[in-house]
A protein has these predicted regions:
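Single conserved hydrophobic/aromatic residue that forms the stacking wall/gate
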Residues: 1-11
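Conserved RecA-like P-loop NTPase ATPase core
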Residues: 8, 29, 46, 61, ...
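Post-Walker A helix-loop "phosphate-sensing" segment adjacent to the P-loop in P-loop NTPases
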Residues: 12-24
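Conserved C-terminal "switch" segment of AAA+ ATPases
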Residues: 18-21, 104-110, 116, 122-170, ...
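Short glycine-rich substrate-engagement loop in P-loop NTPases that contacts/grips substrate
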Residues: 24-53
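Conserved P-loop NTPase "ATPase switch" module shared by AAA+ and STAND
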Residues: 29-30, 53-72
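Canonical AAA+ ATPase core
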Residues: 64-71, 80-126, 131, 143-144, ...
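C-terminal helical "lid" subdomain and adjoining coupling/linker elements of P-loop NTPases
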Residues: 148, 163-216
Length: 216
């Protein structure tokens, strides 16, 4: 989302301004960008990502997913071990930022003795407001070439105002917005599948009835 991206770029620019990094570029990944399914592949993939981020900022979103896997077939820990070594080897020209929900990130930091010593500066971002989540929804619609009707937009505002106020279990900020839009698009597809005359405007327009009743 645009708001989160602005925060990342601001942090990057500050490190660049004080000379902590030489290039100032941003490399953003999540678990899928680091972990592979076979022994040895994860270390190699993670090392390549680290190499690509040298001189800049490596941003790892939902970093806790690297250490909360179950069973011996999970290679997230291999990525963490490689990351820690890379941070030590390149500590003079690499900034690594890990992000995620507070409680899960605490578990992540507790999973390896080396993590807390290396990740010892914390920034707590407030949850998105309802209006920010609606803005993210509108932007995501544009990216996927959808539009919200006036009534649909009002329904979205009602939904996110209530959800942000109550913050039910599983509340997930921008991920809620993505899931909400996916369900709205699915509902719209079901609604128009039986229509005889469907033009581009109908295909692109999400109506209030496509949003009413969505549960996350």
């Amino acid at each position: 989302p645009r708001v989160r991206r602005q925060r990342q770029m601001c942090i990057r620019d500050r490190y660049k301004a004080i000379g902590a990094i030489s290039k100032g570029h941003l490399v953003e990944v999540d678990r899928s960008g680091l972990v592979c399914g076979y022994i040895g592949q994860t270390a190699s993939k993670t090392a390549e990502v680290i190499e690509s981020a040298l001189g800049g900022v490596l941003f790892i979103d939902e970093a806790y997913t690297l250490t909360n896997g179950k069973g011996q077939g999970d290679f997230g820990q291999e990525a963490v071990d490689t990351l820690l070594k890379g941070m030590e080897d390149h500590r003079d020209d690499l900034v690594v930022i890990v992000a995620g929900y507070t409680e899960l990130m605490e578990e992540f930091l507790d999973s390896n003795p080396g993590l807390r010593s290396r990740f010892n500066k914390f920034i707590n971002f407030e949850d998105y407001t309802a209006e920010e989540e609606v803005e993210i929804l509108i932007n995501n619609c544009k990216k996927q070439e959808y539009m919200l009707s006036r009534d649909a937009l009002e329904e979205a505002r009602r939904f996110f105002t209530e959800r942000v106020a109550n913050k039910p279990e599983g509340y997930a900020n921008a991920r809620d917005v993505r899931n909400y839009l996916e369900k709205a698009i699915s509902n719209q597809a079901s609604r128009i599948v039986g229509l005889k005359d469907v033009d581009k405007n109908i295909l692109a327009m999400l109506e209030k009835e496509d949003l009413v009743g969505i549960e996350l």
